[in-house]
């Protein structure tokens, strides 16, 4: 069972980490330290974990729903999840190695990291404004998401 409170808590943690990291990565000297690296991979783990929870628990009922609009929305979010994971893996392959951040070009790193943060934050906003209300409407439960 997954509650909306759990999903919102995960999203809140992701947003907090992205805000802190956004500030920290601006200073090149702070990018290579262990604390920044730990925070960065905590962010990565939180995002991956959140998407995995949604993939495993939220979409099945929506994909099997009789209303085509509900199915379509579920397919869009599932597709978006796959795309975010693909972009994430590409990003990690470029900038990380065995849970270490490898920065050759700080400006490019900052830009691509900010783009990734924006992608994830837009996803969180879409979940909050579209997906979670749809699940509440379809299930009739304002507390349990799946």
Regions from the language model: what does each represent?
Residues 1-146:
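Small-residue-biased structural context
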């Amino acid at each position: 069972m997954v509650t909306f409170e759990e999903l919102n808590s995960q999203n809140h943690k992701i947003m907090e980490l992205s805000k802190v990291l956004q500030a920290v990565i601006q200073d090149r000297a702070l990018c290579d330290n262990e604390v920044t690296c730990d925070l960065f991979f905590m962010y990565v783990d939180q995002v991956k974990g959140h998407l995995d929870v949604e993939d495993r628990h939220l979409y099945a009922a929506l994909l099997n729903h009789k209303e085509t609009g509900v199915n379509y929305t579920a397919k869009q979010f599932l597709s978006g999840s796959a795309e975010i994971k693909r972009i994430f893996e590409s990003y990690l392959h470029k900038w990380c190695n065995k849970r270490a951040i490898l920065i050759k070009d700080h400006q490019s790193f900052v830009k691509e990291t900010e783009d990734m943060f924006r992608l994830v934050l837009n996803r969180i906003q879409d979940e909050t404004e579209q997906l979670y209300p749809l699940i509440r409407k379809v299930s009739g439960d304002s507390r349990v998401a799946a």
